Amino acid sequence: YEKLLRQLVPGVEITAQACPLFVPLVEAGYVDHSEESRQQVTKLVIAQYLTEVREAGVDTLILGCTHYPLLKTMIGEFMGQSVTLVDPAKTAAHHLEQMLSERGLKAAQEHEGQAHFYVSDVPDSFVQTADLFLGEYKGGPVDQIAIDKY
C-alpha cells in the first residue's frame, strides 16, 4: 500500500503498523459481535498495536488484510470518530466487477457459480470460520497455496 499511496498522493504522510495477531484472533472467532470476553481480548490487542498510530494523529486507517474488517467496529471505537476506516476489499471487489462487466466477462446473474477457495492457512481452519467472511459458507473445494509463490 505504501508504495502505491506515495505514487498516487505525493507528499502523503504514512504511518504503517503490522498487526500479525489480528489474523489468528479473527480465525478463532474473536471478532466484532462475539462474546464480550472474546472482545475484551481483541480490544487489548488492538490497543497494543494501534495506540501509537492513534497518537500519531492519523485521519485515515486502511484495513490492509482481508481479516481486519471483521474487527472494524472495535478498531473504529478505539481509533475514534475522527478516523476514517477504509476496507480495500470492498473497493477491489467493486473494481473487479466493473472490469469484468466492461470486458463482457461478467457472468449472468441468473446462474449461481461454483466456488473454489484458495487459502494460505490450513484449509480446515477456513471451513470452520468461512461464515465470518462470507456470511454463509455454501461449501466448495478449499486448497492451501504458498502465497509467497504468487
Predicted regions and their residues:
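Non-catalytic structural scaffold of enzyme domains
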Residues: 1-150
